[in-house]
């Protein structure tokens, strides 16, 4: 059975995660406050960031950068800036 949460990213009730996807306190916050839909949006941005900036997830500095971008996107409402990318709605 799915859980319904108030998603702080979408600002509405939505289906919550099935399990904690990220470790630690931040992971608990994501589990309790971020819906599946919002997480899917983040995953698309994350993939673009990793590819465009050529991030290596074995590098602790790259992981830290990605985590900062994730917090900014999911909790602070900041858009992820990817050089050279223009969203379709702005073209």
From Swiss-Prot:
Question: Does the entry feature the keyword Phosphoprotein, yes or no?
Answer: no
Family matches, as InterPro entries = Fe_traffick_prot_YggX, Fe_traffick_prot_YggX_sf
- A GO cellular component annotation in the UniProt record: cytosol
Q: Which Gene3D superfamilies match?
A: Fe(II) trafficking protein YggX
> What are the BP-aspect GO terms?
cellular response to oxidative stress
Q: Care to name a GO molecular-function term for this sequence? A: iron ion binding
Q: Which UniProt keywords apply?
A: Iron
Which is an annotated Pfam family here? Iron_traffic
Which top-rank group of organisms is this from?
A: Bacteria
* Cross-referenced HAMAP family: Fe_traffic_YggX
Q: What does this protein's UniProt record list under function?
A: Could be a mediator in iron transactions between iron acquisition and iron-requiring processes, such as synthesis and/or repair of Fe-S clusters in biosynthetic enzymes.
Q: How does it assemble?
A: Monomer.
Q: Which family does it belong to?
A: Belongs to the Fe(2+)-trafficking protein family.
Which protein is depicted? Probable Fe(2+)-trafficking protein
Q: Which organism is it from?
A: Cronobacter sakazakii (strain ATCC BAA-894) (Enterobacter sakazakii)
